[in-house]
Amino acid sequence: MNVVFAVKQYISKMIEDSGPGMKVLLMDKETTGIVSMVYTQSEILQKEVYLFERIDSQNREIMKHLKAICFLRPTKENVDSLIQELRRPKYSIYFIYFSNVISKSDVKSLAEADEQEVVAEVQEFYGDYIAVNPHLFSLNILGCCQGRNWDPAQLSRTTQGLTALLLSLKKCPMIRYQLSSEAAKRLGECVKQVISKEYELFEFRRTEVPPLLLILDRCDDAITPLLNQWTYQAMVHELLGINNNRIDLSRVPGISKDLREVVLSAENDEFYANNMYLNFAEIGSNIKNLMEDFQKKRPKEQQKLESIADMKAFVENYPQFKKMSGTVSKHVTVVGELSRLVSERNLLEVSEVEQELACQNDHSSALQNVKRLLQNPKVTEFDAVRLVMLYALHYERHSSNSLPGLIVDLRSKGVAEKYRKLVSAVVEYGGKRVRGSDLFSPKDAVAITKQFLKGLKGVENVYTQHQPFLHETLDHLIKGKLKENLYPYLGPSTLRDRPQDIIVFVIGGATYEEALTVYNLNRTTPGVRIVLGGTTIHNTKSFLEEVLASGLHSRSRESSQATSRSASRR
């Protein structure tokens, strides 16, 4: 179950099927992102694809010497653009691939437009999602719900993305969903409808234990996306932002022109692949080793250019040398900027208190520490408000709750009103009233003992004590202990055996910390394969945008106690 491999296979098959000769790859905005996540431009160039064009680009030239490979989402706009294209074809022959199921009527319209008979084939290749890591995918949708209900357009897109994922992995799953979320049940029903309607597509070889799709809602754990991160990939996303593997470094003081935007992709960057799940401290020493390795290779290459043979050897090694030099400067810059932000924003201290708020239950200590940090001028308004949010979520119903006082402290610190208002919005979004689970207190005697012992001996790393709630959910699922009254099956059948292939989908967005949890479970649990997906991949900033987009913050307390109004059609 490797989503990067699945999408890669589709794209290389498209290119192979078009045969030898020069080609153009014709895409839309979304499929451009889908392709760029798994292939670099230079890799595709090696496959005789010399031009990359957007179907919606108005000024494309006529190039009859090129074959066109079209990879498009089956939207009305794309079908209309293709109809126009086929009426006046710019290329010699067209191989058309849709990233999802296309209706018979659309295929008929395309056939009618193809008067010059330039279409060689029309196929469905189900690469309709963003493959982030081998076990992680996203749909790049921010703001999927209105209140507690789906935005209809986003429900449709999410259903398409999730069914495409199942088809690309050749899985016809049983479905379980989070009972406390109406949105999770609704998505499950939509996926089930597609499976029933397109049953021929889902007729895969039956496995002894059927695969399982588990649909969760971000509302059940609003803590995880609010925490600072200390593993490489998660930390880069939290502090710098990752957008389709691209990192914008243009704001870094004194940045050179060629490093204003860098790409971090485990597919093409060995250092990143080996370090993405390691702690920040380890990254520092690994960067040092990388630099030393680079330094060792560098003088040797330059000293020995005495004979023609030396020069030939250097030229042969140069692409690798140049690539290594690019890798070194990229990671040194990224890690340098992370270090600068950690120090400038006092993040070690901030993160320690965040972890206390997420993992411990000592109210007076937590309150004291939050108040102390709110007085610290180095703590930014963004970090100050996130600490208050974590406090508000954890101690929402504590008898000594001091949230009003902390809001006053935020105002005294000069925190903008838009941030202060977000505190109640986050509680409205993921507070105790809407959670189907208890995020904070240990559930059983074993867990209580573990927490007690942890408290006695201290934790190995104070900055990474927190484990996402997803860890416990998946642990119970793998052991066959996930309660059916909290996570019911959709439909009458239930799974007798422990699941082996699990697809988890989080409405409202997953996080890189959860992706790390899944990576570790895959590594340490033989016979179990888990893939995680979400409407998007959040950092704190995008999560707060998600909360704002839901519109829950704008309701008065009274109306929010009533049932959320139904989603209005946009």
From Swiss-Prot:
Major place of residence: Golgi
Tissue: Ubiquitous; expression was highest in testis and in brain. Detected in every part of the brain.
GO BP annotations listed: intracellular protein transport; vesicle-mediated transport
Modified-residue entries (Phosphoserine), positions: S307, S441
A Pfam family reported for this protein in Swiss-Prot or TrEMBL: Sec1
Keyword annotations of the record: Endosome, Golgi apparatus, Membrane, Phosphoprotein, Protein transport, Transport
Membrane topology of this protein: Peripheral membrane protein
Taxonomic superkingdom: Eukaryota
Annotated SUPFAM superfamilies: Sec1/munc18-like (SM) proteins
Location within or outside the cell: Golgi apparatus membrane; Endosome membrane
GO CC term, one of those recorded: Golgi apparatus
Sequence similarity: Belongs to the STXBP/unc-18/SEC1 family.
Role according to the record: May play a role in vesicle-mediated protein trafficking from the Golgi stack through the trans-Golgi network.
Subunit structure as annotated in this protein's UniProt entry: Interacts with STX6 and ZFYVE20.
PANTHER family from the UniProt entry: VESICLE PROTEIN SORTING-ASSOCIATED (PTHR11679)
Protein name: Vacuolar protein sorting-associated protein 45
Naturally occurring in which organism (per UniProt): Rattus norvegicus
